[in-house]
């Protein structure tokens, strides 16, 4: 089943937490570099293998519903504490994102300003306005990058429903990255 109707984001923090792809945040990935499953359908295998062989794909991996269902949403990455997202009020469709360590880098604060009550006391998502910018900070956890404000719950709902019929280990998500 193609994920396009369910998931149409390119969130590298999520891909890093699940598969280790572009894992700039430093998450401990759940299913890194597994390649294609040995029992993958021949049609999908031939399509994906040709893309990987041609250098059009970075790599492939897969993860079972059993593994996804056991994820710890409070798990944090090793390199960063949060993610800043901002956009101009006049261009809400053009989002900018930056992963931030603790303390926040001065260049990030110069762009987005200082949230109230301050960058070091934010325990949950915080939104604020700086001039023409709408800004948001969220702590960086597995739950934040795969949670309800993302498109992943749609994917997980379908996988959970299929697992009800085929078992938790009988349902998996197969991915390939360019």
Set out the residue ranges of the language-model regions.
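Acidic (Asp/Glu-rich) sequence patches and key acidic residues
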Residues: 1-168, 178
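Conserved GNAT acetyl-CoA-binding A-motif
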Residues: 170-173
